[in-house]
A protein has these predicted regions:
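Conserved functional hotspots at enzyme active or ligand-binding sites that engage polyanionic ligands
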Residues: 1-113
Length: 113
């Protein structure tokens, strides 16, 4: 499936039974479809307070993102998702959310030094 960075997708998460879960594509668009996997961050609607909230940006449901509930981007659970496990693109994140996601990824990956 053709996906772009910032797309919110429904995907089958490894090790979890049940329905597909939402996640955000964080892989660079320049990689195109040359890989069999796509780097993603899963979302959770079980929004919790954490010690470093910058690490789990919150997204409110909006017309363009396809979400039905307030959700957290779990940057600390980023993983390479097989392309064949991505079921659909349901929306995309806005610029503000992209900026907050980028900041969280810089910290998680140790690049914000």
């Amino acid at each position: 499936m053709d996906v772009k960075r910032g797309d919110i997708v429904l995907m089958v998460v490894p090790g979890e039974l049940g329905r597909p879960r939402p996640g955000i594509v964080v892989q660079a668009d320049e990689l195109g479809d040359v890989t069999t996997t796509v780097l993603t961050c899963p979302l959770t609607s079980d929004v919790q307070s954490i010690a470093r909230p910058i690490l789990r940006p919150v997204i409110e449901p909006a017309r363009g993102n396809g979400l039905r509930a307030r959700s957290q981007i779990m940057t600390d659970k980023m993983f390479a998702q097989r392309r064949d496990r991505i079921r659909a693109v349901i929306g995309t994140i806005d610029r503000e959310t992209t900026a907050r996601l980028n900041a969280a990824l810089l910290i998680i990956l140790g690049l914000a030094l």
